[in-house]
């Protein structure tokens, strides 16, 4: 009897050692190291650089409104464009402090409502924080104020100097930039403490840092990069009818530059790359979890998309009008990224895509 009991105990111990291990036990990957790299070397520096460009934009706006002249207008446009380009490197991080401050909804709703902007300027009475003004503020609204709709620099300058509502227009411009600066400052400040939360929220649940990051990347790429910057303007969502007025930076005519800055920073984020350093990224995570083939597809498709987007020229709206098929071809390259990004990678890492999408990819 005792011999039989001993055999049973040994058998039970043997079976317990044969239990399937959790995913975290089966595969070895330094998730904490990846989050530290992404947070410390990519996200925080991106916001800090963006804040610096917004500070410069604010100073340039003060200089221009105090003394409106052509050199100051041109300098303001340079500062505006630089801030807009640097925003592209932050837009993907719509979680944590960015979500708390609703950066995307406040900074980059386009096409902007020019009629509403004109009414706000004419009345001199406005509140840019109300929901009804969501499409009359941020970078797209500033784009319209500084460039106008195919109007000369002399005319634009006159709207800030001699026109009936010149004082109101200066006030509106300053209010828009102050709004961007205020929310940028708040977000950068919040990341000072949130970075610890980001680096220590391990695991793969929806609320984990990995879950937030992968969901944010997918939502951004699909809705705001692929569709917003290319698909919608070229007519993918309108039965092939082009909508060139819906390009980003339509009035300043540097839509393709914004697209390229956005896609390049997205590619670097996936690779964990900052500057010339290739740190731990989602690519390494996939390889560690036997997802080398998925990583290879993502790398190749992203690289192909970067090359394709670099063939676009500004003004993108004009290229859409003159050669719609060439822009549709770029969209096709962007589209190839979707399956490995949205389906294969999250499945391999055990991350649930939790945002809603109704366009059928």
Where are the predicted features?
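C-terminal motif of bacterial Sec signal peptides marking the signal peptidase cleavage site
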Residues: 14-17
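Short, conserved catalytic or interaction motifs in soluble domains
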Residues: 20
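Positively charged n-region of N-terminal signal peptides that target proteins for export
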Residues: 1-4
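Mature extracytoplasmic or organellar-lumen-exposed domains after removal of signal/transit peptides
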Residues: 23-361
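Sec-dependent N-terminal signal peptides
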Residues: 7-12
């Amino acid at each position: 009897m005792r011999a039989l009991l001993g055999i049973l105990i040994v058998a039970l111990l043997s079976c317990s050692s044969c239990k399937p291990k959790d995913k975290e036990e089966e595969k070895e990957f330094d998730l904490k190291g990846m989050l530290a790299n992404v947070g410390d070397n990519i996200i925080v520096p991106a916001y800090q650089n963006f804040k610096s460009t917004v500070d410069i934009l604010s100073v340039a706006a003060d200089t221009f409104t105090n003394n409106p002249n052509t050199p100051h207008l041109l300098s303001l446009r340079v500062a505006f464009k630089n801030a807009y380009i640097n925003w592209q490197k932050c837009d993907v991080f719509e979680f944590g402090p960015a979500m708390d401050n609703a950066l995307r909804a406040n900074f980059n709703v386009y096409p902007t409502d020019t009629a509403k902007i004109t009414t706000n300027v004419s009345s001199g009475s406005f509140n840019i924080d109300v929901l009804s003004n969501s499409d009359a503020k941020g970078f797209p609204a500033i784009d319209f104020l500084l460039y106008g709709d195919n109007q000369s620099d002399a005319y634009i300058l006159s709207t800030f100097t001699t026109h009936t509502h010149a004082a109101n227009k200066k006030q509106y411009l300053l209010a828009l930039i102050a709004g961007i600066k205020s929310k940028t400052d708040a977000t950068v400040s919040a990341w000072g403490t949130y970075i610890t939360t980001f680096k220590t929220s391990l695991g793969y649940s929806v609320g984990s840092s990995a879950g937030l990051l992968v969901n944010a990347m997918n939502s951004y790429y699909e809705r705001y990069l692929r569709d917003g910057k290319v698909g919608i303007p070229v007519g993918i969502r309108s039965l092939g009818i082009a909508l060139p007025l819906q390009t980003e930076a339509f009035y300043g005519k540097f839509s393709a530059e914004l697209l390229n800055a956005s896609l390049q920073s997205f590619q670097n984020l996936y690779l964990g790359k900052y500057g010339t350093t290739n740190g731990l990224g989602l690519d390494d995570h996939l390889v560690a979890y036997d997802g080398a083939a998925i990583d290879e597809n993502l790398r190749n498709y992203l690289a192909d998309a970067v090359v394709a987007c670099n063939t676009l020229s500004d003004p993108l709206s004009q290229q859409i009008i003159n050669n719609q098929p060439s822009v549709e071809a770029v969209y096709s390259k962007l589209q190839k990224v979707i399956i490995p990004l949205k389906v294969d990678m999250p499945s391999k890492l055990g991350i649930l895509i939790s945002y809603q999408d109704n366009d059928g990819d």
